[in-house]
Swiss-Prot record:
Transmembrane residue ranges: none
Disulfide pattern: none
Originating organism: Schizosaccharomyces pombe (strain 972 / ATCC 24843)
Name of this chain's protein: Pre-mRNA-splicing factor prp5
Keyword annotations: mRNA processing, mRNA splicing, Nucleus, Repeat, Spliceosome, WD repeat
Lineage of producing organism: Eukaryota, Fungi, Dikarya, Ascomycota, Taphrinomycotina
UniProt superkingdom: Eukaryota
Family: Belongs to the WD repeat PRL1/PRL2 family.
WD repeat residues: 161-191, 203-233, 245-275, 287-317, 329-358, 370-399, 419-449
Gene name of this polypeptide: prp5
Cited Pfam families: WD40
Subunit structure, interactors included: Belongs to the 40S cdc5-associated complex (or cwf complex), a spliceosome sub-complex reminiscent of a late-stage spliceosome composed of the U2, U5 and U6 snRNAs and at least brr2, cdc5, cwf2/prp3, cwf3/syf1, cwf4/syf3, cwf5/ecm2, spp42/cwf6, cwf7/spf27, cwf8, cwf9, cwf10, cwf11, cwf12, prp45/cwf13, cwf14, cwf15, cwf16, cwf17, cwf18, cwf19, cwf20, cwf21, cwf22, cwf23, cwf24, cwf25, cwf26, cyp7/cwf27, cwf28, cwf29/ist3, lea1, msl1, prp5/cwf1, prp10, prp12/sap130, prp17, prp22, sap61, sap62, sap114, sap145, slu7, smb1, smd1, smd3, smf1, smg1 and syf2.
Functional description taken from the UniProt entry: Required for both cell cycle progression at G2/M and pre-mRNA splicing. Interacts genetically with the PRP4 kinase.
GO biological process: mRNA cis splicing, via spliceosome; mRNA splicing, via spliceosome
A Gene Ontology term for the protein's cellular component: catalytic step 2 spliceosome
Length: 473
C-alpha cells in the first residue's frame, strides 16, 4: 500500500514538471536565441555627468547645494550647472544636458523627483542635487600681518648688590629710579640713569615677591613669602601699614591705576582686594584651585586678571567680586601676565605657550610660538615690543601685532655663579619703553637698551615667512 502511494506521488510531480516546461516553451520559445537590445544611453550620460560634477565641479563652477545634515547655505547654480529635462509620460526619453553659455543662469536646482523617475539611477548620483561637496568649499586662510622691523636689544648695564635671587621689580612713575626685591629679604632702590644704589629697605623676614610704587602717593607697597603685605612711606623710609589676611605666601601685588585699591594674590589660591587707606579686605576673589602666580590690574572692566597654577586665567568683576570669564586654553601653570599699555589686550605666559588675548570677554587672538621654556615674565612697551624671559635664561623679543619673534638672546651668568643660575624671574620696561630691566637668578639686575643707529639693513630681524597652514589652537 505504501509503495503504491509513493508511485502515485512521483507521477504527480512528473506531471507538474512537464506542464511547467510546456508552458515556458509556449511563452518564450519563439524568442529563444535572439539578442535582447538595451539602450544604456541614459545610464552612460548620468554616469558621465556625475563624474564631471564630482571631479571638475570646483573648476567648472558646478552646483553647490545645501547639505542636509550640516545646514550649509544654498548657493546659486553657476554658468556650468547641470539640469534634467524630464518627460513624465516617457521617462526613457529623459536626457541630461549641460549649459555652455556662461551668461545663462538657471533659477533653481536639480530636481530630485526628476532623477528618481530615471530607471537605475545609483544612490551616489543623487548627491548631484541638494548636497554640497565639502571638497568644493574654499576655506580662506587667516589674515597674516607682516611684522614691523624693530631695533635689536643689547646689554647696557649689570647691577650687583643683592645676596639672593632677584624676584621682582617696579619703576617709579617719574622714571628716576626703580626698586627690586630679592631672596635676601631686602628691597633696594636704584638710580635708573646710573645704576647706583640709593636705598635699602629691610623689614620682611622672607623672600620679597612683589613691589608696586604708587603714582599718586609717596608710597611703596611690597609683599613676600612671609604672608605680609607692607606699605612703605618713602618720605620716612618706614612701614606705615600692614595688610593682614593671606594664609600663605603672597606672590603678586598690583595697584589700581585710578582707585586707592591694592590687589594681592598668593599661595592660598585667592586674590585679595584691599582698601589702601583703611587696610580693610574689600573682596576675596576665590575660585582658583591652586596658587595664584600672576596678576594684572587695569582701569576698565574686567579690572582684575589672575593667572594660576591650575592652568586657568580668570577675569574678575571688581565691583561684585565675582568671576566674569574663565580661560582654560593653557595646559600648564600661568606664570606671567602683561597688559598692553595702549591697547585693550594682554598676554599670558606659560611653559606650553605665550598667548594673546583681547578684552573684555577674553577673546583668544593667537599664540606667540617659539619660546620653548618655562616663561616666568612678560613685558610690553608702547612700541609693540613684547619681551619674554624664561627660567633657563633665554630671552625672546616679539612683534606684538604679528606675533613674530624677531630676536633671541641668552642671559650670561655673572662670574662665580652656576650656569643653572641663568633664570629670569621678573622684568619691566621703564616709562619710556627704551630700557628693559630684568631680575635674574645670578643675583644681578641687568638693563638692556636698543642698538643705537640701527637700521633694517645693518641689523635685520630674524627672518619671517608667512605660513600656509591653517592653525588650530
Amino acid at each position: 500500500m505504501t509503495e503504491a502511494k509513493n508511485i502515485s506521488d512521483d507521477t504527480d510531480v512528473l506531471s507538474l514538471t512537464t506542464n511547467s516546461l510546456r508552458t515556458s516553451k509556449t511563452l518564450f520559445g519563439a524568442e529563444f536565441g535572439s539578442v535582447t537590445s538595451f539602450d544604456d544611453t541614459v545610464a552612460q550620460n548620468l554616469k558621465r555627468t556625475y563624474k564631471e560634477h564630482l571631479e571638475y565641479g570646483s573648476v567648472l563652477g558646478g552646483t553647490v547645494g545645501k547639505r542636509k545634515n550640516r545646514h550649509y547655505e544654498e548657493d546659486t547654480i553657476g554658468s556650468n550647472a547641470l539640469t534634467v529635462r524630464a518627460d513624465s509620460e516617457n521617462p526613457s526619453s529623459q536626457v541630461i544636458t549641460k549649459f555652455s553659455d556662461p551668461n545663462k543662469k538657471i533659477a533653481g536646482q536639480v530636481s530630485m523627483q526628476s532623477l528618481e523617475k530615471i530607471k537605475g539611477v545609483p544612490e551616489a548620483a543623487h548627491r548631484i542635487a541638494g548636497e554640497s561637496q565639502a571638497s568644493l568649499v574654499k576655506r580662506t586662510l587667516a589674515e597674516q600681518i607682516r611684522p614691523e622691523w624693530h631695533a635689536p636689544w643689547t646689554l647696557m648695564r649689570v647691577i650687583s648688590g643683592h645676596l639672593g635671587w632677584v624676584r621682582c621689580v617696579d619703576v617709579e612713575p617719574g622714571n628716576q629710579w626703580f626698586c627690586t626685591g630679592a631672596g635676601d629679604r631686602t628691597i633696594k632702590i636704584w638710580d635708573l640713569a646710573s645704576g647706583v644704589l640709593k636705598l635699602t629697605l629691610t623689614g620682611h623676614i622672607a623672600t620679597v615677591r612683589g613691589l608696586a610704587v604708587s603714582p599718586r602717593h609717596p608710597y611703596l607697597f611690597s609683599c613676600g613669602e612671609d604672608k605680609m603685605v607692607k606699605c612703605w612711606d618713602l618720605e620716612t623710609n618706614k612701614v606705615i601699614r600692614h595688610y593682614h589676611g593671606h594664609l600663605s605666601g603672597v606672590y603678586a601685588l598690583k595697584l589700581h591705576p585710578t582707585l586707592d585699591v591694592l590687589v594681592t594674590a598668593g599661595r592660598d589660591a585667592v586674590a585679595r582686594v584691599w582698601d589702601m587707606r583703611t587696610r580693610q579686605n574689600v573682596h576675596v576673589l576665590s575660585g582658583h584651585k591652586s596658587t595664584v602666580a600672576s596678576l594684572a590690574v587695569q582701569e576698565f572692566d574686567p579690572q582684575v586678571v589672575t593667572g594660576s597654577m591650575d592652568s586657568t586665567i580668570r577675569l574678575w568683576d571688581l565691583a561684585a567680586g565675582k568671576t566674569l570669564t574663565t580661560l582654560t586654553h593653557h595646559k600648564k601653570t600661568v606664570r606671567a601676565l602683561s597688559l598692553h599699555p595702549d591697547e585693550f589686550t594682554f598676554a599670558s605666559g606659560s611653559s606650553d605657550n605665550i598667548k594673546h588675548w583681547k578684552f573684555p570677554e577674553g577673546a583668544f587672538m593667537g599664540n606667540f610660538e617659539g619660546h620653548n621654556a618655562i616663561v616666568n615674565t612678560l613685558s610690553i612697551n608702547s612700541d609693540n615690543v613684547m619681551f619674554s624671559g624664561a627660567d633657563n635664561g633665554s630671552m625672546c623679543f616679539w612683534d606684538w601685532k604679528s606675533g613674530h619673534k624677531y630676536q633671541e638672546l641668552q642671559s650670561v651668568v655673572q662670574p662665580g655663579s652656576l650656569d643653572s643660575e641663568a633664570g629670569i624671574f621678573a622684568s619691566s620696561f621703564d616709562k619710556t619703553g627704551l630700557r628693559l630691566i630684568t631680575c635674574e637668578a645670578d643675583k644681578s639686575v641687568k638693563i638692556y637698551k636698543q642698538v643705537d643707529n640701527a637700521t633694517p639693513e645693518t641689523h635685520p630681524n630674524l627672518p619671517w615667512t608667512p605660513s600656509n597652514l591653517r592653525r588650530r589652537y
